């Protein structure tokens, strides 16, 4: 499959089935490499073009040794803006809500500008963002009455990840990594408890593999939206605030990833908040039970739903610092096994090894 054809697939708008059809026409799938790692990037890791390109470099380093799939949060602060729009709508301040929505759109267009893509790629991604912006504004009418219930809340909240997935896929392609944005509501099936929906894992796995495995086999990095799913009849749901870590675990489970690496803005998991305690100590190794006990004691470890799923599937979870990638981070899992090649490759590249 040529890079030109991969880029054609990444430009496709519409259903995942359309992406798969383009990949099929492009000449079939390449042999999948043995190791598979899921990267989840938090909002602070994606705040602006420079950070996106830095994170893209981490993905690029990992792809030399492994297949990689990426799950993204919204850029830091964007979900709060979107929830503010929902509250403003509930108060009946439609004009103000619409201005807020336009500001969210403008924020992402600034990041697109700062990515400095080629003219063709820039126009393509701008068009994709404008389609999303049109859908966002459709949720925020300029006049009339608006029912601002939980279902609309979830539709509004979903736009942050949908914007960031398109931008990060563009950052990856600029870095030489073929990538496509994938909207998780196309395959993450949930109940209809809006704002805190529970995923149906088995159905999600069946549907998700149909979407994601052809892209993996073709050597394309899927950039999947965290946080969101959909009911069986297609209504967008969210998995609860700060649930993108959980989304990362779900996607890793779908593709049977060897590891889930959660990239954040700290070096790993500490015994206490290092900003509040001089005695805080970085923990390099934790069992699932130890991590669960820390979380139960109130420590900020991971989203509460990550650990049960990781333990059930014996998935190794790493917590690492996007901005200090040479730091080892914290490993959560069963007794230690030889280090995963993707992790070793990143550390080597950060110390002057092959990029």
State the predicted function of each range.
Residues 1-307:
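Nucleotide/pyrophosphate-binding catalytic subdomain
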Residues 3, 331-355:
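A conserved regulatory-domain signal marking ACT and ACT-like small-molecule sensing domains
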Residues 163, 324-325, 329:
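Conserved ATP-utilizing enzyme core subdomain
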Residues 185, 319-324:
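Acidic carboxylate-rich catalytic motifs and surrounding loops in phosphoryl-/glycosyl-chemistry enzymes
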Residues 198, 317, 336-337:
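Alpha-helix boundary/capping detector
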Residues 303, 314-321:
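Acidic/polar loop patches that form or flank catalytic/metal-binding clefts of enzymes
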Residues 310:
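Acidic-aromatic/histidine active-site loop/patch
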Residues 313, 326-328, 350-352:
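A generic structural signal for well-ordered coil/turn residues at beta-strand boundaries
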């Amino acid at each position: 499959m040529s890079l030109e054809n991969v880029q054609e697939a990444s430009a496709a708008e519409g259903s995942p089935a359309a992406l798969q059809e383009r990949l099929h026409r492009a000449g079939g799938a390449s042999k999948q490499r043995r190791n598979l790692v899921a990267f989840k990037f938090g909002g602070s890791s994606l705040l602006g073009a420079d950070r996106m390109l830095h994170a893209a470099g981490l993905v690029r380093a990992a792809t030399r040794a492994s297949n990689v799939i990426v799950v993204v949060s919204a850029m830091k602060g964007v979900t709060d803006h979107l929830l503010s729009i929902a509250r403003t709508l509930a108060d009946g301040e439609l004009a103000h809500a619409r201005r807020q929505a336009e500001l969210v759109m403008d924020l992402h267009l600034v990041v697109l500008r700062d990515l400095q893509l080629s003219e063709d790629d820039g126009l393509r991604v701008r068009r994709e963002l404008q389609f999303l912006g049109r859908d966002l504004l459709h949720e925020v009418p300029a006049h009339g009455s608006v029912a601002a219930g939980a279902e609309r809340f979830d539709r509004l909240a979903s736009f942050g990840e949908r914007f960031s997935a398109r931008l990060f896929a563009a950052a990856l392609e600029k870095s030489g990594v073929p990538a496509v944005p994938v909207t998780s509501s196309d395959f993450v099936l949930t109940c209809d408890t809006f704002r805190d929906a529970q995923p149906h894992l088995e159905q999600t796995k069946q549907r998700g593999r149909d979407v994601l495995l052809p892209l993996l086999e073709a050597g394309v990095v899927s950039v999947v939206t965290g946080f969101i799913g959909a009911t069986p009849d297609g209504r967008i749901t969210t998995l609860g605030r700060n649930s993108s870590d959980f989304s990362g675990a779900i996607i890793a489970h779908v593709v049977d990833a060897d590891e889930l690496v959660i990239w954040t803005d700290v070096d790993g998991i500490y015994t206490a908040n290092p900003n509040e305690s001089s005695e805080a100590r970085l923990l390099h190794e934790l069992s699932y039970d130890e991590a669960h006990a820390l979380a139960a004691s109130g420590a900020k470890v991971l989203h509460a739903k990550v650990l049960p799923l990781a333990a059930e599937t014996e998935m190794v979870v790493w917590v690492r610092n996007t901005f200090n990638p040479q730091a080892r981070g914290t490993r959560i899992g069963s007794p230690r096994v030889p280090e995963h090649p993707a992790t070793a490759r990143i550390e080597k590249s950060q110390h002057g090894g092959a990029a």
